């Protein structure tokens, strides 16, 4: 649709994702398939279309996917390991694909949010969420959007996973 309307594609942002909170031994085959289908396959197929269009344009472009900081730095006892495995797969894809398409100036990057002020965390008191980051503040949707825009415009950045999590990814603090 964007191609028909504008005639080209400069950037793709893949923001589809689901998150199932279950202990590892409680995930079913259907749970895994749903996670893999949405979190991995969805990105693969839309990115393939974008790459083909960018190749046809011969102008390069930027592909940014939204992953999760927990994929790299899980919270002890957090029951979302399989969901984070799929997000970690996206992080690996960004590194691999950026290498594969760098010579064509097609860049792949990811934004890995931590805890975000969103409906997903609406029932958790904000002061508790803020304690999960060294900065003592909660990531906003606007923080994520700013990181995405930055990566789409930063022509010399490829293969990066940008953590937008108030410093939580730096480890024990």
Where are the predicted features?
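Conserved NAD(P)H cofactor-binding loop of Rossmann-fold oxidoreductase domains
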Residues: 15-20, 167
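Catalytic loop of short-chain dehydrogenase/reductase
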Residues: 64-89, 94-103
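A short, exposed helix-loop element centered on a Lys and neighboring polar residues
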Residues: 47-48, 95
